[in-house]
């Protein structure tokens, strides 16, 4: 029996790739645990680490550690025997939801996104029932799909979610620009939730300023289906190809409609992007302090 060390370098939710690593090694009889640092490195036969973001600091790891994730290389892949393994929740005993992909890939080629490079064109990945394997998951499902409606089984999967009365979080967001009436109507029948499963939220994105007309049309479709603006959260990308004025216009347009903007800085080290994101995303400050007053106090 080998001893396997696991290290999650970033990310706020359980790491599915590391869960597959754990699942594979547990299946062949290995002992899997969290890696405890260089002082204990010699006790492990193999060490795996995952890094999702390039800006995350890299700790010192043994030379033979297997390091993967988009923060290291867009194109790296799990070995087939690990990719095909059933994820193990043993690393995350407090995880109280089911986690997985119903599809992978993306139909779009946004210049700021690595998904098309890493996953390619959309393809179906798992059925809803295949994802429901967490013994502590209850009726909570978190889907990691980057282009949910790009999968050919999107309708069957939504109907299954509705049938099973699952609370579902589309954590990567949905594309409201091309949302159809049928899709909006089925979403309205879902018990859609936020990341903590304690509020009714559907997450979309307004990344490009010029998509404003499409965003408004998508919001109207949601309203027509019975989804109120108060249930709509929008990722708002800043610092890529928009001006501060365009950032403010998108945020205030959404806020004035009763939707919830959530700013995503393209460059977290940029002073303006960091401050603007903090101002918008801290709801109490956003509602009570003007940007002109806040930005001067953060200089």
Enumerate the language-model features and the residues they cover.
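A short, structured N-terminal alpha-helical element that caps or precedes a catalytic domain
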Residues: 1-67, 72-75
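Canonical Radical SAM [4Fe-4S] cluster-binding loop centered on the CxxxCxxC motif
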Residues: 17, 94-131
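Flexible glycine/acidic-rich beta-alpha junction loops that bind and position SAM and/or redox cofactors
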Residues: 238-244, 262-299
């Amino acid at each position: 029996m080998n001893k396997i060390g696991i290290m999650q370098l970033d990310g706020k939710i359980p790491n599915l790739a590391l869960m597959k690593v754990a699942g594979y090694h547990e299946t062949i009889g290995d002992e899997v645990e969290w890696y405890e640092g260089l002082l204990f490195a010699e006790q492990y036969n193999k060490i795996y680490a995952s890094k999702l973001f390039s800006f995350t600091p890299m700790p010192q790891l043994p030379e033979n550690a297997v390091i993967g994730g988009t923060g290291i290389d867009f194109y790296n892949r799990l070995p087939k025997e690990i990719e095909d393994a059933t994820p193990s929740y043993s690393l995350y005993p407090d995880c109280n939801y089911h986690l997985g992909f119903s599809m992978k890939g993306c139909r779009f080629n946004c210049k700021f996104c690595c998904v098309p490079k890493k996953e390619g064109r959309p393809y179906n990945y798992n059925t809803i029932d295949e994802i429901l394997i967490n013994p502590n998951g209850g009726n909570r499902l978190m889907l990691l799909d980057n282009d949910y409606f790009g999968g050919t089984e999107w309708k069957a999967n939504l109907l299954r979610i509705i049938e099973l009365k699952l609370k579902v979080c589309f954590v990567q967001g949905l594309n409201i620009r091309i949302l159809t009436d049928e899709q909006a109507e089925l979403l309205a029948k879902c018990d859609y939730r936020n990341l903590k499963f304690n509020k009714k939220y559907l997450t979309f994105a307004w990344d490009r300023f010029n998509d404003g007309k499409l965003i408004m049309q998508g919001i109207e479709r949601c309203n027509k289906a019975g989804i109120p603006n108060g249930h709509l959260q929008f990722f708002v990308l800043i610092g890529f190809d928009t001006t501060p004025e365009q950032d403010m216009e998108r945020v205030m347009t959404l806020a004035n409609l009763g939707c919830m903007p959530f700013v995503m800085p393209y460059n977290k080290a940029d002073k303006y992007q960091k401050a603007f994101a903090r101002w918008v995303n801290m709801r109490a400050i956003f509602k009570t302090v003007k940007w002109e007053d806040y930005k001067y106090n953060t200089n």
